[in-house]
């Protein structure tokens, strides 16, 4: 059964847990129009690949930025700085694959951190 977590403006629906696949995690991400999240970041231990299903996702890896349309994909090697946004007028839906998986609990913890920051700020 899939698990849904909201992290700020991002909705994440976990489809495949890495514990079931020897390390590969897969989730569907929904990003509303106008969303510019997350800030630039990197994963030292994880490879990431995004495949767009609907909408146009602006995806940046290091110094390369592309507007990904349905059927387009882009990969993020370990240690590469990346971020994404939805500058369009419709919700973006994309599949995100991580290896090794960081797990749904990582996103729950991120969501709790955002809630705490919002309450204090």
Roles of regions detected by a PLM:
Residues 105-121:
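Acidic/histidine-enriched, glycine/proline-rich intrinsically disordered or flexible terminal extensions
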Residues 11, 49, 56-58, 65, ...:
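Structural motif
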Residues 28-32, 42-60, 97-99:
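Short, conserved beta-strand element in jelly-roll/cupin
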């Amino acid at each position: 059964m899939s698990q849904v977590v909201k992290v700020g403006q991002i909705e994440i629906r976990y489809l495949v847990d890495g514990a079931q696949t020897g390390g590969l995690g897969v989730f569907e991400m929904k990003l509303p129009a106008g969303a510019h999240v997350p800030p630039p970041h990197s994963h030292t231990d994880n490879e990431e690949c995004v495949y767009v299903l609907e909408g146009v996702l602006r995806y940046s890896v290091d110094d390369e930025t592309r507007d990904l349309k349905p059927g387009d994909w882009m990969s993020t090697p370990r240690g590469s700085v990346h971020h994404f946004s939805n500058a369009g007028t419709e919700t973006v839906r994309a599949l995100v694959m991580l290896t090794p998986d960081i797990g749904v609990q990582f996103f729950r913890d991120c969501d709790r951190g955002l809630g705490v920051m919002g309450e204090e700020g």
